[in-house]
Amino acid sequence: MKVQLLKIPSHLIVAGSSWLSKIIIAGVQLASISYLISILGEEKYAIFSLLTGLLVWCSAVDFGIGTGLQNYISECRAKNKSYDAYIKSALHLSFIAIIFFIALFYIFSGVISAKYLSSFHEILQDKTRMLFFTSCLVFSSIGIGAIAYKILFAELVGWKANLLNALSYMIGMLGLLYIYYRGISVDIKLSLIVLYLPVGMISLCYIVYRYIKLYHVKTTKSHYIAILRRSSGFFLFTLLSIVVLQTDYMVISQRLTPADIVQYTVTMKIFGLVFFIYTAILQALWPICAEL
């Protein structure tokens, strides 16, 4: 008598791995607070918290290319067609996008940082612009690197994306623990690089790996136009969402004391831990629905 094994739907596997990943990431973020306050002090950690608010803003640096590509991959899979040319085209466009935003950040970092971090001018003095620019670079690597995860989700192996994402945050936390227990003196910029740069670098390494595999694939003008046309709508939606959901950091940077900013940050981390249950299911179901 054959025993028929229960097949777990792929979206539940992805959702389950996403829950585990988000728990690890939220745990890292919450645990890092006490270490960062010990390393930097309350006022500098408040600055660190404001800079991490740029992470969501920098998620728009791919111009919606990742989400547009994810939909095309799902559509091609449903029709049993190759989507390699779409991936290569998207990676070319994302490279142009990141160059554009790096130039944009370099030009406007001085003006924006002077306003955004105006409450901490005495602490930062003339380091405001470079600190803001460095933060944008680190978080932009995460924004562009997210394209790698969009590809994996579209290929219905989102558990790999969740694994890589959780691993990258754990590496950042290990770096922070090394600094803390070694008693190494670091500033805000280096603390931010140690904790968040691995998050961007791991996903970017996967993008390089996929590009090398697709080096021989030929692309046409129609592939680029298709990606841009699909991505523009997602980019606009992302911008509107950011404006609505991230205005709070602009307000607290001007109105709250360092102690209040720290308290607000902790509260938002806890809220994010609860909110991930919904987002994990949505993230897992999206590519499946797109193939229907």
Name these PLM-found stretches.
Residues 12, 49, 81-96, 128, ...:
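Interfacial transmembrane-helix starts/ends
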Residues 162-212, 268:
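Hydrophobic alpha-helical transmembrane segments
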Residues 63-78, 154, 271-292:
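Helix-loop junctions and terminal segments of transmembrane helices
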Residues 1-11, 126, 185-193, 204-245:
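Interhelical loop/hinge segments that connect adjacent transmembrane helices in multipass membrane
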Residues 119-145, 192-197, 201:
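Alpha-helical transmembrane segments of multi-pass membrane proteins
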Residues 11-12, 139-164:
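Membrane-interface junctions at transmembrane-helix termini in multi-pass inner-membrane proteins
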Residues 9-71, 98, 102-106, 138, ...:
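Signature of the first transmembrane helix
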